[in-house]
Amino acid sequence: MTRISLTRYLVEEQRKHNTIQPELRLLIEVVARACKAISNSVNKGALAGVLGSAGTGNVQGETQQKLDVIANEVLLDANEWGGHLAAMASEEMESFYEIPNRYPKGEYLLMFDPLDGSSNIDVNVSIGTIFSVLHMPKPGQTVTEADFLQPGTHQVAAGYAVYGPQTTLVLTVGNGVHVFTLDREAGSFVLTQSDVQIPEDTKEFAINMSNMRHWAPPVRKYIDECLAGDEGPRGKNFNMRWIASMVADVHRILTRGGIFMYPWDKREPEKAGKLRLMYEANPMAMLIEQAGGAATNGHIRILDVQPEKLHQRVSVILGSKNEVERVTRYHHEAAGQQG
């Protein structure tokens, strides 16, 4: 059986669909190489002295782990000189990073969470990198934050790498979701699954149950029904899964179905949610929809949310289509009753 590398897949997709421009193909390959380098650092762990806190905080007010900083620098260094990008934005940086004048500038914008789930680093649980690619609205002109503030429907590519028992790259360029596994001996990502599809129904949900008392009534209603099992209104038993790493939880859902929820809660009512729209929710929503699932903030499709700032937060409900639609319907019903 012929093994298909990431490069070959991208070239053949361009021939079939004419949707992957050469600059985009090269950009995706550079991001993949950066993910390989991050994977190597993650795998070395304590042997390389990269575990533990970096002693600094990021723009989100979160404590940075050493690997957060390393992963961010790897992605910046790998992508700044190739001529594919106009600018980059990261969870770990307050402002965007414009490509220095000493390098040619391209027509794309790259956003990323360099190391999602970093609270799991020291306990050796799967973590990952999430990325999103947009067109630069005004190629050749000075980049502003407004150039990044495009709805998720404008993404030209999205994906993530999960660093677990294997290093896996999951990618969409708008023609379905495809999975690549890192062959460490060959040093390349190899296509191992094509056209991933999420079952429309599920018996698994992923949510942090310790926050239940803080949720809005529609979310509590849905979870109460799941917990009631086959004796409740759903007529079936559900299992709960929660890894506290969005990459790992979403990867499980892409693999076997389920629903992932990180909803608004009343502890910080002024915030729409916890997860970041631009480089967490949007790329994951694109992947989920391309695999036949759904992704909303409880009210509207995540990909339709118009960003207002770079580090905007959003409530996230994504996964198996029928389950996501049920939770969204509960939100609409509650809003109608309040109105």
From Swiss-Prot:
Mg(2+) 1 binds at residues 91, 113, 115. It is an enzyme of class 3 (hydrolase). It holds the Pfam family FBPase_C. Substrate binds at residues 116-119, 208, 274. Disulfide bonds: none annotated. Pathway: Carbohydrate biosynthesis; gluconeogenesis. Its cofactor is Mg(2+). Keywords: Carbohydrate metabolism, Cytoplasm, Hydrolase, Magnesium, Metal-binding. CDD domains: FBPase. Signal peptide: none annotated. GO terms for biological process: fructose 1,6-bisphosphate metabolic process; fructose 6-phosphate metabolic process; fructose metabolic process; gluconeogenesis; sucrose biosynthetic process. The keyword Metal-binding applies. It catalyses: beta-D-fructose 1,6-bisphosphate + H2O = beta-D-fructose 6-phosphate + phosphate. One of its GO terms (molecular function) is magnesium ion binding. Binds 2 magnesium ions per subunit. It is found in: Cytoplasm. Belongs to the FBPase class 1 family. This is Fructose-1,6-bisphosphatase class 1. It comes from Cupriavidus pinatubonensis (strain JMP 134 / LMG 1197) (Cupriavidus necator (strain JMP 134)). The gene is fbp.
